[in-house]
Amino acid sequence: MPGYCFEIFNVFDFFDKTNKANFWEFVRLEHAQVMDIPISGTVNHFLKPENLRKNRYHDVTCWDNSRVVLSSHGSKMYDYGDSDGKKIIVTSQDSDSTYIHASFVNGFKEANKFICCQGPKESTSGDFWKMVSEHNSSVIVSLTETDDEDQVCYEYWVKEEDYELAFGRYVVKTLEIIEESSFTRTRLRLTDVSSDTSREIHHFWYPHWSDYGNPTNPAEILNLISKVNQKRKEMKKTADSQPGPIVVHCSAGIGRTGTFCTIDNALSQLRKEQTVCLPQTVLKIRKQRHSSVFLPEQYAFCYKAVRYALIREIKKKFFY
């Protein structure tokens, strides 16, 4: 990055560095250096009085330059009549807001691969599904538990097959729930009743990652990242139109979410260029998603996951 010099490692140098006795102390110092780098930008839309209630946390800001902008639908009401018990009406009214606490984030040499956002609140779930619809996203990754009190993340989809949630013009039906080894994959159908159009959404839910901790097994996150990318690749081949960004969220949308995107970027860089530079990767993400990877433990986990992935690939190459 201009003005900041970080070492770019090839695979062998990366292993050599991570094998040193003082490496994890070095990682903590490197994380502090990255956190101290000033990033210029404004957060005016985050601070607008009419948007304050849409922010889950008052101290987790959202950049203006990379924010996701929604269209204005007006505040039309939709009459769903007497639902059959399997359709839950969260709200019958469209949201007229163009603001959502969400940011475009690049992949490695792939513009806007991700939309990183806060965990939807009950009052912003309609905006969330509007974002998914308008930006043609087909894959959602949730890295947090949900809770009835809406303190962490509202349950914006139903964890039971054949049930539906209605958010104004958007109806989300759970078609199939597939329990994988460490996460849950759900096939959803998103319908825009105003145009009578629908499409399939693939939802990946990994609730075992605590807010201030890390997964005990890096293989779980690596497997999740692999399955998410595999599904997106499949949809690129079969969809009528190119799938939009992968939507990733936790609760605030910066810690676990930023860590997920960092690992994905680093692995892509390794595959394409056989090099990796985690501080540079994190800094790039922080320029698009404010305050990402803010904990040293999250930063260290990025190193652990990349190292684990490399060891696994070497074992496959030489022992299988």
Swiss-Prot record:
Q: Quote the protein name from its UniProt record.
A: Tyrosine phosphatase H3
Supply the EC number(s): 3.1.3.48
What lineage, starting at the top, does this entry show? Viruses, Viruses incertae sedis, Polydnaviriformidae, Bracoviriform, Microplitis demolitor bracovirus
Catalytic activity of the protein? O-phospho-L-tyrosyl-[protein] + H2O = L-tyrosyl-[protein] + phosphate
State the species of origin.
Answer: Microplitis demolitor bracovirus (isolate Webb)
Hydrolase is among the record's keywords: yes
- Which SUPFAM superfamilies did the record assign? (Phosphotyrosine protein) phosphatases II
InterPro entries in the record: Prot-tyrosine_phosphatase-like, Protein-Tyr_Phosphatase, PTP_cat, Tyr_Pase_AS, Tyr_Pase_cat, Tyr_Pase_dom
Catalytic residue positions = 250
Biological processes annotated in GO? symbiont-mediated suppression of host innate immune response
Q: Where is the Tyrosine-protein phosphatase domain?
A: 22-309
Could you tell me the keywords of this UniProt record? Host-virus interaction, Hydrolase, Inhibition of host innate immune response by virus, Protein phosphatase, Viral immunoevasion
Q: Mind listing the GO molecular function terms for this protein? A: protein tyrosine phosphatase activity
| Broadest EC class assigned to this enzyme | hydrolase
Extract the Gene3D superfamilies matched here: Protein tyrosine phosphatase superfamily
Matching entries from PROSITE patterns are given as: TYR_PHOSPHATASE_1 (PS00383), TYR_PHOSPHATASE_2 (PS50056), TYR_PHOSPHATASE_PTP (PS50055)
Record bears the keyword Transcription: no
This molecule's function is given as: Suppresses host immune cell adhesion and phagocytosis.
